Amino acid sequence: LEKIHSLTAQGLVSDKSRVLFVNDGSRDKTWELIQGFAAQDEHYIGISQSRNRGHQNAVLAGLMEALHSGTCDVTISIDCDGQDDINAMDEMVKKYLDGAEVVYGVRSRRDTDTFFKRFTAEGFYHVMNALGADIVFNHADYRLISTRVLESFADYKEVNIFLRGMVPLVGFAHDVVTYERHERLAGESHYPLSKMLALAFDGITSLSNKPIRIITGAVSYTHLRAHET
């Protein structure tokens, strides 16, 4: 909330801006905390999903809620673990005012990650790009999106949600803001290797036809070899 007040004081955003929390079906007291914030200050609002539908669907739910509210010009998505620098929002909004419809938050380095996390994460980006997915290196889901982009994005009916690759497909002018990633405020990452692999699979199958070509080629080769024998 302090960040909204700061942006408002600089004349970058309206005082009507809001902080929207998305509760992804958590079983702890997260939703109670969100309701408490909303009861204390009108700048806080929240939505709660009936069950855990995954990080990407939670982000999408927040974006669509913001779009359908009909009151915002831009939406900035950010995780609540404290690792993404909220001060990067100032530059994001400035770049939007300069004409960018999408502004990607990009980590300048990954010093706070373990070697294994850094190795697998960077490998993920390289593999996705090699398979033809147009994603921004070291960008996760910290980004500014204009309502104009969200309106076009809402037309996508993907089953496997992979926002890092889907947003660039919409087009529109874009820019990048780099920032240093912080340590987590609490808890542990909910993106172990298994979830990263699942995310990679969703991204590959929804954004690239290269796996289909590879599989088709393998099937054709097997079929030919079977006939030869």
Language model region names:
Residues 2-15:
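Short, acidic, metal-binding catalytic loop of nucleotide-sugar glycosyltransferases
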Residues 175-181:
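Catalytic beta-strand/loop signature of glycosyltransferases that borders the donor
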Residues 204, 209-221:
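Alpha-helical segments in transporter systems
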Residues 222-229:
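Conserved small/polar residues in nucleotide/adenosyl-binding loops
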Residues 45-66, 74, 83-166, 182-201:
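Acceptor/aglycone-binding surface of glycosyltransferases and processive sugar-polymer synthases
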Residues 23-31, 82-83:
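A conserved acidic beta->alpha catalytic loop
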Residues 13-25, 48:
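Short beta-strand/loop segment that forms part of the nucleotide-sugar
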